[in-house]
Amino acid sequence: MDTTHAHHTAAIRFFPTAQRNGWATCPLVQNAFVRIFGQPGYRNGPGSPDLARQLLAHYLDFSSHQFLPDDISLCDLARFPSLAGPKALTDLYLLALAVKHGTRFATFDSGINHSLIPGGTAAYHLIPTT
């Protein structure tokens, strides 16, 4: 996709493993991909949300892909006993979603406090960038 992205090489190394073991997206992640990658000004992007959506649809057709519904709430105190700052909410939400569905949350972000989510430490997977 974006060969100039800081983590492009790491993503290329990681994706074959994800394909073998299975990988997942949810509406939140899909929307973010189309919104960001589809911006006309995004360098090396497809130029429009429609084209980004077509590219996303191609990857979603892979047999290794699993769709996870956005079926948890930040108001569920059992899943979210404590919240970090506002910049961490989306990552914690995605981590809790992975816990609920018995999968893992793969990320390049080493700053996520995965211990805030019950089961989060086991579900957190940091993708190596070096």
Kindly give the residue locations of the regions a language model identified.
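Residue-level detector of structured alpha->beta connecting loops
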Residues: 19-22, 64, 102
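Short, well-structured N-terminal submotif of metal-dependent ribonuclease cores
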Residues: 1-25, 37, 41-51, 120, ...
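Amphipathic coiled-coil/heptad-repeat helices and related helical stalk/stem segments
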Residues: 11, 90-91
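Acidic catalytic patch
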Residues: 3, 27-31, 53-83
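Acidic, PIN/NYN-like endoribonuclease modules and their adjacent C-terminal/linker elements
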Residues: 72-84, 92-130
